[in-house]
């Protein structure tokens, strides 16, 4: 009996010592290699990998205390990937809380109004913090990856600034931009004026992309939309240069010639009636709004005045 009591006493003492040692370790300040240390946690990293990374960097004395702490708090899978800037005095428990809250440094990328998909792919490919997973994928494969129902990639991504953590894939960002565009497009489609000669939201997107390339003047968008709507209603050709330029692709040298306007191709709105088969650029929210809420006008023509604005008329005189 005395031996058993002694054994229990020893076990209790060891347990108390271990608890005390563990408490001391998780509340003691970690050691940063530099005054400000950037910790990069890659997407998909598990607790063991993160703990080993911290231990290898000399930030924590042992990976096991960090693992036990996270499991004890039931936060084994709660640490968020990203780039973290560690400064000042942090304990292991404070570090865990910091990583769980996901206060990671955000990277950003901008998609600009009027851009083509080729320009989007270029900036995605050149961004050092983005994993370029679309390399080698066809347009159709990209559409499949992002869950798009469209058959062409042009114009379906919303122009905006997108924030992301280092290591995010270009496909993830494209999917966000696609869903954002769909949300905006559906919202404005549901509020469109009646009797528009546009049968689907996608046709509205096509028209909006043309409006985007025709003017940079906010005050002209609705009026230009009104002209195009009038021409569509009357069965007139749109006769808009930006669609021809888009159809020429790399053949366009900056100078649009008469022969270009006469040469038939699927984006030549001088030779073909109706809308082109796809959008030609990323339309802004203002252009989408104009396409679905055009100005009430009798105008059928407009010409640039040279100051970024346009002059409208009912005839060519």
What would you call each of these model-derived segments?
Residues 12-20, 24, 202-206:
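Hydrophobic alpha-helical targeting segments used for export or membrane insertion
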Residues 1-14:
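N-terminal Sec-pathway targeting helices
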Residues 11-12, 74, 152, 257:
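Alpha-helical interaction segments
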Residues 46, 121-122, 126-134, 144-317:
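Bacterial extracytoplasmic/cell-wall-associated proteins, especially those involved in peptidoglycan
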């Amino acid at each position: 009996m005395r031996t058993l009591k002694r054994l229990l006493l020893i076990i209790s003492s060891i347990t108390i010592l271990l608890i005390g040692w563990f408490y001391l370790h998780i509340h003691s300040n970690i050691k940063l290699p530099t005054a400000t240390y950037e910790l990069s946690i890659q997407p998909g990293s598990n607790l063991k990998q993160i703990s080993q990374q911290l231990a290898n960097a000399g930030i924590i004395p042992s990976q096991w205390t960090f693992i036990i702490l996270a499991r004890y708090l039931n936060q084994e899978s709660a640490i968020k990937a990203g780039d973290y800037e560690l400064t000042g005095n942090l304990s292991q428990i404070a570090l865990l809380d910091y990583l769980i809250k996901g206060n990671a440094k955000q990277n950003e990328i901008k998609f600009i109004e009027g851009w083509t998909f080729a320009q989007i792919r270029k900036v995605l490919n050149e961004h050092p913090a983005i994993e370029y997973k679309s390399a080698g994928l066809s347009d159709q494969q990209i559409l499949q990856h992002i869950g798009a129902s469209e058959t062409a990639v042009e114009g379906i991504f919303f122009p905006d600034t997108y924030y992301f953590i280092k290591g995010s894939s270009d496909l993830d960002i494209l999917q966000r931009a696609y869903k954002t565009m769909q949300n905006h497009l559906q919202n404005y489609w549901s509020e469109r004026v009646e009797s528009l000669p546009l049968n689907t939201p996608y046709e509205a997107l096509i028209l909006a992309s043309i409006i985007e390339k025709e003017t940079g003047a906010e005050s002209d968008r609705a009026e230009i939309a009104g002209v195009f709507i009038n021409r569509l209603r009357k069965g007139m050709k749109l006769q808009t240069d930006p669609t021809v330029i888009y159809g020429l692709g790399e053949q366009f040298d900056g100078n649009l010639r008469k022969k270009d306007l006469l040469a038939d191709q699927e984006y030549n709105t001088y030779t073909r009636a109706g809308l082109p088969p796809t959008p030609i650029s990323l339309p802004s929210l203002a252009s989408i709004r104009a396409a679905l809420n055009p100005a009430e006008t009798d105008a059928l023509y407009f010409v640039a005045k040279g100051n970024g604005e346009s002059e409208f008329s009912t005839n060519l005189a």
